[in-house]
A protein has these predicted regions:
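Glycine-centered flexibility motif
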Residues: 34, 77, 112, 132, ...
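Gly/Ser/Thr-rich helix-start
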Residues: 21-23, 68, 74, 112, ...
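Short, glycine-/small-residue-rich phosphate/pyrophosphate-handling segment
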Residues: 99-151
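Generic structural "secondary-structure junction" signal
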Residues: 73-77, 97, 105, 134, ...
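N-terminal beta1-alpha1-beta2 submodule of the flavodoxin-like/Rossmannoid cofactor-binding fold
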Residues: 1-95, 166-215
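Short glycine/proline-rich, acidic loop/turn segments that cap or connect secondary-structure elements
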Residues: 146-163
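Short, local alpha-helical segments
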Residues: 103-105, 163-169
Length: 215
């Protein structure tokens, strides 16, 4: 019998981000808004101000979406400091099999920010999490396109945004805000799908490593 998932609890998502000047914080709120539209219960957490309660939220979430400004072609020092505090959780498998995704913002159109998304994905992989890509085609790549297209900068691993270095946080490009909102919606939907699968298939409800072959 098909399972519609309505009897499954709403997925719990946490948006864990670092923002140096407020632009990435705007994108974090957009991801959260999209996740709520898809029925998620969302917490937004600035990782440079972590409390014990924040760590508990991350540990209990079904999904964590990571976000960082791109500085010098990689995640910010603030995000990296947070990542390095998760070492024991990585060792213990605390976040194993949670869903993950990522987003970033830079001052330049490219800014080498794909490296930031790669770093976020590798961080998630080290925690044995399931990475969700952006799920959008490229925008602004034809004569009929414009900078107002979703995914205007053409990223697939996660959401990539660009904000002028002298712009205020309320001047983050509307297309980038909508792209991050899409990411939140998509990752919440995937998380719900995974939760439904775990509910109806006992084999899917246990950590993947528990049934892994030994050599």
């Amino acid at each position: 019998m098909p399972h519609n998932g309505f009897d499954i609890a709403a997925p719990a998502l946490a948006i864990a981000y670092h923002s140096g000047f407020g632009h990435t914080a705007v994108l974090a709120d957009a991801v959260a808004a999209g996740a709520r539209e898809a029925g998620g219960v969302v917490s937004v957490i600035a990782v440079d101000r972590m409390t014990d309660a924040d760590w508990d939220i991350l540990d209990g979430a079904d999904c964590i979406v990571f976000g960082s400004a791109t500085y010098m072609g990689n995640v910010s020092a603030g995000f990296q400091a947070f990542a390095e505090k998760t070492g024991q959780r990585c060792h213990n498998g605390t976040w194993r099999d949670k869903v993950a995704a990522g987003f970033t913002n830079s001052g330049a159109k490219s800014g080498d920010k794909v490296q930031t998304l790669v770093s976020l994905a590798v961080f998630a992989a080290q925690h044995h999490m399931h990475w969700v890509n952006l799920g959008l085609g490229a925008g602004w790549n034809s004569s009929r396109g414009s900078e107002n297209d979703l995914n205007r900068l053409g990223f697939w691993l996660g959401a990539g945004a660009q904000t002028d270095v002298d712009a205020d946080p309320d001047q983050v490009h509307p297309s980038d805000v909508r792209t991050c909102r899409h990411l939140g919606w998509r990752v919440a939907l995937v998380t719900r799908q995974l939760n439904v699968g775990r509910a109806v298939t006992p084999a899917a409800s246990s950590p993947a490593a528990s049934s892994a072959p030994t050599r």
